[in-house]
Amino acid sequence: MKYPDFTLENKLSGVIAGVDEVGRGPLAGPVISAAVVFIDRNTIIDGINDSKKLTPQCRQVLYEKITSVAKFGIGMASVEEINSYNILQATKLSMKRALIDLDLELDYVLVDGNQPPEVKWQVKSIVNGDNLSTSIAAASIVAKVTRDRLMQELHNKHPEYNWYKNKGYGTKEHLNAIGLYGITEHHRKNFAPISRAL
């Protein structure tokens, strides 16, 4: 398996943040972004990869390692903001907030995908960036673990939707629960399965 590395970061100079989001697709819960900066790019953390390729246990271990050696920021766009704008604009807002939370003077921002937020720093969009850049892959892990923990908290309040397992995604189980119990304030009302249930 090929792992991300610092090739992209090393082609640039200065302080470089990797940014990624988690939670664009679910029917419930916020979208979360993380920004990660490895000040020392000689830092080696074995196993960093796109969070979708890792087990939950592996993500937890890597999260602890990443957050102990790297600078990081977290940004969230709420369900209310997703409902008010749209998921793309809410995602950009969460990315911008993650960079603000990072609270560093940056030279470049590497963003996974091709729809970056408008920020004051130089931005490079990297399609499949979480497979290429260690900074972006690390951000994907931090964002994923952060959102999973939040969905666990929401699950404790609404166990009937089993968000602990489905993380708010539109699984058959989740859709069946919506049919049985209706929707909560944590559901995204402008997403088709939810808007049809209103």
From Swiss-Prot:
Location in or out of the cell: Cytoplasm
Binding site for a divalent metal cation: D20, E21, D112
Cross-referenced SUPFAM superfamilies: Ribonuclease H-like (SSF53098)
Gene3D superfamilies registered for this protein in UniProt: Ribonuclease H-like superfamily/Ribonuclease H
Summary of the function given for this chain in its UniProt record: Endonuclease that specifically degrades the RNA of RNA-DNA hybrids.
UniProt-listed NCBIfam families: PRK00015.1-3
Protein name as it appears in the record: Ribonuclease HII
UniProt source species: Wolbachia pipientis wMel
Gene: rnhB
